[in-house]
Amino acid sequence: MKFLKIENNPEKAVLFQNMGVDRIFLDLEILGKKERQKGLDTIISESHSINDVKKLSSVLTSSELLVRINPLNINSESEIEKCIKDGADVLMLPMFKTKKEVQSFINIINKRVKTCLLLETSQALCRIDDILSVDGIDEIHIGLNDLHLSMGLDFMFELLSGGIVEYIIKKIKPFDIKFGFGGIAPLDKGLISGEMILKEHVRLNSSSVILSRPFDALLDNDFQSFEDSFIKLKNKHSFLINNRSKIDFKNNMITIKKNIVNILKNKL
């Protein structure tokens, strides 16, 4: 599994790389994002700039650089061209709704770097079969924040407990496209603990996850706290993979569902 960390500071990116973070995630998406996620405890990377692509690619040697661009618009081609020219390894398209948008994204990139779709709209979910028919999709990440908003849900992990994530994954698997979903907290933190979410990633054979806001909170203390929690997460993932036949995945989901019921009681 690839672990992703949102970061635009080259010095910090190198530190994350050295501790084994697989991908540094540069977030250029700004179009419509504030309005969609207003009032939510989500990461909006206002300080990230397209000029950071070259700064990061010039210092990364083992970690890949993933760049989330803006939703498709009249400036997309120039944005994509600069990202590729400046050294991005993977480009991620957010907020797409149609096969046509995906095809345009794939055509502009033209196999020069890896492509990743961020599936996070109800329209894309309903049109998943048409979208998957496009050649050239390397990866799909299911974005729980915006997808749960798009579907009018109250908590992003309802998509997991309600079977929507698994439904999407079953659609993806025949196409041999790598996939991941959402973010993850340290093993013992988060509204739904990182350990419970990690077990779902293992059960569903996910190949990527983003280190979420509770990991950033550890950086307020010191880098060592972050690294210790990250290494524990990686080691736990290896343990679960090697012992998956002994893991009670069914009971894990029962616990997740109970926790979500309690969370929603407090929200409503």
Can you say where each PLM-predicted feature lies in the sequence?
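Glycine/small-residue-rich loop that forms an oxyanion/phosphate-binding "nest" at active or ligand-binding sites
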Residues: 61-94
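C-terminal alpha-helical cap/extension of soluble enzyme domains
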Residues: 76, 174-268
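Catalytic cores of alpha/beta
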Residues: 10-19, 75-85, 101, 122-135, ...
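Hydrophobic faces of well-ordered beta-strands that scaffold small-molecule active sites
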Residues: 1-6, 24-26, 65-69, 91-93, ...
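Active-site-adjacent beta->alpha loops and helix N-cap segments on the catalytic face
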Residues: 32-56, 73-77, 95-113, 124-127, ...
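Glycine-enriched alpha-helix->loop->beta-strand junction motifs that scaffold or abut catalytic
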Residues: 19-24, 84-90, 109-115, 133-140, ...
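Glycine-rich phosphate-binding active-site loops on the catalytic face of alpha/beta enzymes
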Residues: 24-34, 88-101, 139-151, 200-221
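Conserved N-terminal beta1-alpha1 strand-loop-helix module at the mouth
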Residues: 1-64, 72-74, 136, 257-268
